């Protein structure tokens, strides 16, 4: 069967840019052919962060939905122009959207992503697949994470026991085996990025160097690790609606002492490393492949190696683009009416065809 061309769009909880990828996909492979990281406007980022903190109006939700749709379409068109690609050669765009709120538990669980897919379809001239999470949640699932299904497609078929760790704003683990498992371990980069932005006027702590200059505040670390999320059994998923500025400030206030900013950064890095290693070590895996922005944090990777000395840790191929590739692949699955194997990951009653199609 001939390979088909799909585009994937991902904008994660870190809000550091829009990742757009071009993939060639068939039943056995998904090959990355091109990618671009499109800048996220500062004013839009600030507005979304304000909305995620629970302060927004219906008018804001509507206008930001359209603004994001325009931003995502501009990002796609930039890739097409750079690579000199005819839009007619693309079967579909898979768009994750920008998560505004993820509420997987309660009487009426939901997950809200913004980024009007109709606007993307009109402005690019390409069919769009979006709204992936809703069907899974209607079937009783968490609606996240979805990457494990793609990880199994991409990295499965080996005799070695392999886990994949994606470190984005949140961190999620995929455990490959007879039964596919995957869930969010907790915060990835989100708290570190938030803290360094507040104190250093940069968007992230390059290579974890600022964290490296500090010392762990153990009472703070222990208090944060007592959060019920970390002991909650999987399936589970989380986001900025849980691990955010208010959550961190609550723990800082409880220390009743003046804390050095670089020591807090060091402690936040340790929180990410320990919460990840606590989960990875449950599965007795031989190999851990890292992807996502956190894979470029040298000090975080170093700490993971120290906490898990018997596991071979490496960086996955195309590590920066695997999340966006996931949604290109999910678009392929939708257009071919193929079920996505996620019920053991999300807790849904059955596997399903995911996503709505916008033309």
Curated annotation (Swiss-Prot):
- What Pfam families does the annotation carry? AnmK
Entry EC number(s): 2.7.1.170
Q: What one GO molecular function would you report for this record?
A: kinase activity
- Residues engaged in binding ATP: 12-19
Recorded catalytic reaction(s): these are:
1,6-anhydro-N-acetyl-beta-muramate + ATP + H2O = N-acetyl-D-muramate 6-phosphate + ADP + H(+)
Q: Does the keyword ATP-binding apply?
A: yes
The UniProt entry, under InterPro entries, shows:
Anhydro_N_Ac-Mur_kinase (IPR005338), ATPase_NBD (IPR043129)
Pathway linked to the protein: Amino-sugar metabolism; 1,6-anhydro-N-acetylmuramate degradation; Cell wall biogenesis; peptidoglycan recycling
Keyword hit for Cell division: no
Question: Which HAMAP family does the UniProt entry name for this protein?
Answer: AnhMurNAc_kinase
| Cited function | Catalyzes the specific phosphorylation of 1,6-anhydro-N-acetylmuramic acid (anhMurNAc) with the simultaneous cleavage of the 1,6-anhydro ring, generating MurNAc-6-P. Is required for the utilization of anhMurNAc either imported from the medium or derived from its own cell wall murein, and thus plays a role in cell wall recycling.
Protein family according to the UniProt entry: Belongs to the anhydro-N-acetylmuramic acid kinase family.
Name of the protein: Anhydro-N-acetylmuramic acid kinase
Q: Which organism is it from?
A: Sulfurovum sp. (strain NBC37-1)
């Amino acid at each position: 069967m001939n390979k088909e061309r799909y585009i994937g769009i991902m904008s994660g909880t870190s809000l550091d840019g829009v990742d757009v990828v071009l993939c060639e996909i068939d039943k056995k492979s998904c090959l990355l052919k091109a990618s671009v990281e499109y800048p996220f406007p500062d004013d839009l980022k600030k507005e979304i962060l304000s909305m995620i903190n629970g302060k927004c109006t219906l008018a804001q939700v509507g206008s930001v939905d359209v603004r994001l749709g325009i931003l995502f379409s501009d990002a796609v068109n930039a890739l097409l122009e750079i690579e000199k690609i005819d839009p007619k050669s693309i079967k579909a765009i898979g768009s994750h959207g920008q998560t505004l709120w993820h509420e997987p538990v309660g009487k009426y669980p939901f997950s809200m992503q913004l980024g009007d897919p109709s606007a993307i379809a009109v402005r690019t001239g390409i069919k769009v697949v979006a709204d992936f999470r809703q069907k899974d949640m209607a079937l009783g699932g968490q609606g996240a994470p979805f990457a494990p299904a793609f990880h199994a497609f991409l990295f499965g078929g080996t005799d070695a026991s392999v886990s994949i760790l994606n470190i984005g704003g949140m961190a999620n683990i995929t455990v490959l085996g007879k039964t596919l498992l995957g869930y969010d371990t907790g915060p990835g980069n989100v708290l570190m990025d938030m803290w360094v932005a507040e104190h250093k006027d940069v968007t992230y702590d390059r290579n974890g160097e600022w964290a490296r200059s500090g010392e762990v505040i153990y009472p703070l670390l222990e208090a944060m690790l007592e959060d019920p999320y970390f002991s909650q059994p999987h399936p589970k998923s989380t986001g900025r609606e849980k691990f955010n500025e208010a959550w961190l400030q609550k723990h800082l206030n409880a220390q009743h002492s003046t804390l050095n900013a670089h020591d807090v950064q060091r402690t936040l890095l340790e929180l990410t490393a320990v919460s990840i290693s606590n989960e990875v070590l449950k599965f007795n895996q031989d190999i851990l492949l890292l992807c996502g922005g956190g894979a470029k944090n040298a000090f975080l990777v170093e700490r993971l190696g120290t906490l898990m000395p018997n596991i071979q840790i490496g960086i996955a191929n195309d590590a920066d683009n695997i999340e966006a590739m996931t949604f290109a692949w999910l678009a392929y699955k939708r257009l071919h009416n193929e079920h996505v194997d996620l019920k053991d990951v999300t807790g849904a009653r059955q596997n399903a065809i995911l996503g709505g199609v916008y033309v």
